[in-house]
Amino acid sequence: MPIRIPEQLPAQNVLLGENIFTMDMDRAANQDIRPLEVGILNLMPNKIETEVQLLRLLSNTPLQINVDLIRIDNQAPKNTPQSHMDAFYHDFSSVVNKKYDGLIVTGAPLALIDYEEVKYWETMTTILEWAQRHVNSTLYLCWAAHAAMYHFYGITRELRDEKFSGVFKHKVNDPNNELLRGFDPSFYAPHSRYGHIDTSLYNSVDGLNVVAESDEVGAYIVASEDKRMVFVTGHPEYDPDTLKDEYLRDIAAGQTPPIPKNYFEGDDPATSPIVQWRSHGSLLFTNWLNYYVYQTTPYDLSQLAEKSQPKR
């Protein structure tokens, strides 16, 4: 899928170097089709790295996508130049009246903070409610998945003493679910989180299905029956070195993190990571775009129906 992004966005050169098709605004304007409108609410500290990871995964099907990068507040991120934020990001207030075919809400390094103590929690809940009226299908990743479960269903995560870190084996629970079309019966995916919600709690919610899970780390992909919400508790978007970088960062900060499981050869951090999740990660995003976004969204987004309120 050619993704339509602003000229000069740093991710463009990275993606072109990987032979991933991007399209500038002028060329896109000459295609006589309606592109999908997808927003990315980027909560990660390193905005540029996350942009590359997600744009890479959005690029693999044959439809055009307009991508809006959205910020949740005006505080300057520690790991991204302010000039980048000013050039490429929309404040939520500037898109509040817009409707989207799809929205991705990223994870955030807030695992050990109570939701109500998060500085932008009030804005976060406003956006969660806004998405019910303005977005056809929303994909929540890691922290955002747990935060949305808490807001919509009152389900509280537990915080583990030791972080889930590594690449874990998962199984397909519902092979007929379109999100998992083309998946192997078992597959691997990265996780990096302290928070955990027991699978039984997801199953207790009417209209939600745990379509893929792990014996080690629990529910991985949870989907609403109406396709309007998808909760992914891991990080299918991660680059090969992301878990390694997080591990080394925590060590440098004086912590004693666990060595990421199933990631280094012989559990030796001096070796190169074993990458065994990228094909399924790409397939998950492709299936979401095709079956949960493109196949269900109205051609005229002004006709987008308000989602019924989740039952708490």
Swiss-Prot record:
> Annotated Gene Ontology MF terms?
homoserine O-acetyltransferase activity; homoserine O-succinyltransferase activity
Q: Which GO terms describe its biological process?
A: L-methionine biosynthetic process from homoserine via O-succinyl-L-homoserine and cystathionine
| Enzyme nomenclature, EC number | 2.3.1.46
One cellular component (GO) term of this entry: cytoplasm
Short name of any one Pfam family annotated for the protein: HTS
Q: Which keywords annotate this record?
A: Acyltransferase, Amino-acid biosynthesis, Cytoplasm, Methionine biosynthesis, Transferase
First-level EC class: transferase
- The positions flagged as active site in the entry are C142, H235, E237
Please name the CDD domains in this protein's record.
GATase1_HTS
Q: Where along the sequence does the record put site: Important for acyl-CoA specificity?
A: A111
Q: Which residues bind substrate?
A: K163, S192, R249
Q: What is its main location?
A: cytoplasm
Quote the pathway field. Amino-acid biosynthesis; L-methionine biosynthesis via de novo pathway; O-succinyl-L-homoserine from L-homoserine: step 1/1
Q: Which reaction does it catalyse?
A: L-homoserine + succinyl-CoA = O-succinyl-L-homoserine + CoA
- What are the site positions for Important for substrate specificity? S192
Subcellular location, record wording: Cytoplasm
- Report the sequence similarity comment from the record: Belongs to the MetA family.
Function noted in UniProt: Transfers a succinyl group from succinyl-CoA to L-homoserine, forming succinyl-L-homoserine.
- This protein's name: Homoserine O-succinyltransferase
This chain's source organism reads Alteromonas mediterranea (strain DSM 17117 / CIP 110805 / LMG 28347 / Deep ecotype)
Annotated gene: metAS
